[in-house]
From Swiss-Prot:
Family the UniProt entry places it in: Belongs to the sugar phosphate cyclases superfamily. Dehydroquinate synthase family.
GO molecular function terms listed in the Swiss-Prot or TrEMBL record: 3-dehydroquinate synthase activity; metal ion binding; nucleotide binding
Location in or out of the cell: Cytoplasm
Species name: Campylobacter fetus subsp. fetus (strain 82-40)
The reaction(s) this protein catalyses: 7-phospho-2-dehydro-3-deoxy-D-arabino-heptonate = 3-dehydroquinate + phosphate
Name of this chain's protein: 3-dehydroquinate synthase
A matching Pfam family: DHQS_C
EC number: 4.2.3.4
CC cofactor: Co(2+); Zn(2+); NAD(+)
Signal peptide, first to last residue: none
Transferase is among the record's keywords: no
NCBIfam families reported for this sequence: aroB
Cofactor note: Binds 1 divalent metal cation per subunit. Can use either Co(2+) or Zn(2+).
Gene name in the database record: aroB
Keyword list, A-Z: Amino-acid biosynthesis, Aromatic amino acid biosynthesis, Cobalt, Cytoplasm, Lyase, Metal-binding, NAD, Nucleotide-binding, Zinc
Length: 346
């Protein structure tokens, strides 16, 4: 299966291939960027598929806490030592962290070289590997340092998901539920009514998410408008991740909690019915996802929103469901209304 990402620029257009990974032929050198966990499972298989002048691999530790500038510097040093040139290619083999970091390294190495994504987690296949967002975290927040830089291709292999722990798989389902809640009521019902243990159902879910994201990115590559909707749940999630030092929750788990918080705010504003709020929360719980987080200080939590990339002119932009299958972008919500919701999670 092939899904095209059309950005109205032949230098940026590319395709997402689902279960079509075969031999990969490149001009110049290739470096595969992976982590210690994924490398042990799949690096050898991927290296055997590559035909290039020279092939290298760079293995970094596994975990969101390593998604920082220091690790980018390490990756770049390995590329310089291997003498990669402008016609070289990086391959991201891993989850969302590897995708973000490899894309960022590719965008700044010698002012930009090609890269492709081979995502090995559900979260990366349905979201992180598609759309060209790259970057790292710092002490001020998540993904605050980065670039928009499109891959040359993305290869989503569902067989890679067989080795995922249940917790990792479920974290990816948070992003699937996000897409369905924002954009497609029928897709949401499909998720409710079908088992992801069925490989064909799972393939359909991945394809649908890629199609949704492809449509959004085609309209708004650099998040100046509709693409911000893909951050539903993330305004809250990024604060949760930062407060827990990226160690307590997987990204998708934090997103699930953020979705529930956003939904309570939407319900308070009359955008979402209590019935739909409960339906979405129960769907998250069905996939073993957390929906609560104990906020120790709602004022501190609220102030952290202003570090969010979407905040402008001292106003926080909230992405909220307007029923299931539709969305609302709001930057006019008064502080007390938000604090009321945050106090519900104390």
């Amino acid at each position: 299966m092939k899904i095209d990402i059309n950005l109205n620029d032949d230098n940026k257009n590319y395709s997402v291939f689902i279960d079509e990974l075969k031999n990969l032929k490149f001009k110049g050198k290739v470096a595969v960027i992976t982590n210690s966990k994924v490398g042990g499972l799949y690096l050898g298989e991927i290296l055997n598929l590559i035909d290039a002048d020279e092939i290298f691999s760079v293995c970094i530790p596994d975990g969101e806490q390593y998604k920082n500038l220091a690790m980018i510097e390490y990756i770049l040093e390995q590329l310089f030592v291997s003498r990669l040139e402008r016609n070289s290619t990086l391959i991201a083999l891993g989850g969302g962290v590897i995708s973000d970091m490899t894309g960022f390294a590719a965008s700044i190495y010698e002012r930009g070289i090609n890269f492709i994504n081979i995502p090995t987690t559900l979260l990366a296949q349905v979201d992180a590997s598609v759309g060209g967002k790259t970057g790292v975290n710092n002490k001020f927040g998540k993904n605050l340092i980065g670039t928009f830089y499109q891959p040359k291709a993305v290869y989503c292999e569902t067989k890679f998901l067989n080795s995922l722990p249940n917790r990792e798989f479920n974290a990816g389902m948070a992003e699937v539920i996000k897409m369905a809640t924002m954009f497609d009521k029928d897709f949401f019902k499909f998720i409710q009514d079908n088992s992801v243990e069925n490989s064909q159902i799972l393939k359909q879910i991945i394809a649908k998410c890629v199609e949704i994201k492809a449509g959004v990115v085609a309209k708004d590559e650099k998040e100046s408008g509709i693409r911000a909707v893909l951050n539903y749940g993330h305004t809250f999630a990024h604060v949760i991740e930062m407060q827990t030092n990226y160690k307590k929750f997987l990204h998708g788990e934090a997103v699930a909690i953020g979705i529930n918080m956003a939904n309570h705010l939407a319900c308070k504003l009359g955008l979402l019915s209590k019935k739909d709020l409960d339906i979405i929360e129960q769907t998250l719980i069905k996939f073993g996802l957390p929906t609560t987080y104990r906020i120790s200080d709602e004022e501190v939590f609220y102030d952290s929103f202003f570090l969010d990339k979407k905040s402008e002119n001292k106003k926080i932009k909230f992405i909220l469901p307007n029923g299931i299958g539709s969305y609302a972008l709001r930057n006019d919500i008064d502080k007390n209304s938000v604090l009321d919701i945050l106090r519900m999670f104390k």
